[in-house]
A protein has these predicted regions:
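Conserved ATP-driven motor cores of ASCE-family P-loop NTPases powering translocation/secretion/packaging/pilus
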Residues: 26, 209-210, 214-286
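P-loop NTPase motor domains
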Residues: 1-215
């Protein structure tokens, strides 16, 4: 399954409000509170629902943009009228609270909509597209295996598309009755690239990405969702997620930092085994 301009669309309404302003538009909430508040108001109006922002509901991004433009140009009648000049008889107005303050936000959004790299996010898709998307990603019936190809997704949106896809899969499982749940394993290959240790050095989009996978690691088993975390650099993986892993498969390791990290999760008395992992042959594992 390929996501991108030469694959499946990933409509912008899949994104939560925080993904929209923080990841797509790269707006920091603490330094642009007025713009974020205006975007939040337009977001819920366009969705015509006050449901949680993380519940994907179809809306037209062009309508959202029009709502912002209307606020940016709003003038309010004072109740008085011009008595002389060219405007005689016309109502007097004052600028609305947000008049002229949303220009940069609107420009950011319009630039993204015009950028051909993001066409797969702004091609209109109806409300039934989410069901179609999940069916394509999950396949049909037990035993189905799908590889999600993200090579066509712009690098700046890659963490967001990964996080939102994982969140959609997880939420899809939450809505199933216990009798209808089909166990789902999400295989995270080269996981250190998007489930990093990082700490305070993480970007906002990386932090939101981690939040999704930490939730799945902690709560997923209750709803039939498990993670298979694969990495050649285990020392660079998020510790919270690693701590939730019940089973570990260790292949050949040469890096001392990686070996020390693995040693920390093994039972006492197993140091001798770790000393030999750099001698493993292809196919050998612990």
């Amino acid at each position: 399954v390929k996501i991108g301009n030469d694959g499946m669309n990933f409509p912008v309404w899949f994104l939560s409000l925080k993904d929209l302003y923080g990841n797509l538009l790269k707006i920091k909430e603490d330094s642009a509170q007025v713009q974020v508040a205006a975007l939040r108001d337009a977001f819920y109006k366009a969705r015509r629902s006050d449901a949680s922002e993380e519940i994907p509901l179809s809306y037209d991004i062009r309508e959202l943009c029009s709502l912002l433009e209307a606020e940016n140009a709003l003038e309010i009648e004072t109740g008085e009228y011009y008595k002389t000049g060219d405007k005689t008889g016309m109502p007097k107005t004052v600028k609305g609270e947000l008049n002229g303050k949303l220009t940069s936000l609107i420009q950011l959004l319009q630039d993204k909509m015009r950028d051909s790299r993001y066409k797969f996010m702004f091609s209109p898709k109806g409300e039934n597209y989410l069901t179609f998307f999940l069916e394509k990603v999950l396949g049909t019936g037990a035993g189905s295996v799908k590889v999600i190809d993200l090579s066509s997704v712009p690098n700046d949106m890659l963490p967001t598309v990964v996080a939102v896809t994982a969140r959609l899969l997880y939420r899809g499982q939450l809505t199933q009755t216990k009798e209808n749940v089909i166990p789902l394993t999400i295989v995270c290959d080269e996981a250190h690239n998007y489930i990093p240790a990082g700490g305070i050095n993480l970007t906002a989009s990386q932090r939101r990405l981690l939040d999704v996978f930490e939730t799945i690691a902690k709560e997923g088993r209750k709803f039939g969702v498990s993670l298979l975390v694969v990495s050649q650099r285990p020392s660079e993986l998020n510790r919270t997620i690693l701590a939730q892993c019940a089973n570990h498969i260790v292949l050949k390791l040469s890096n001392d930092i990686d070996k020390q990290m693995i040693q920390g999760i093994l039972p006492e008395g197993s140091k001798g085994i770790m000393d030999s992992v750099n001698l493993f042959r292809p196919g050998d594992c612990l």
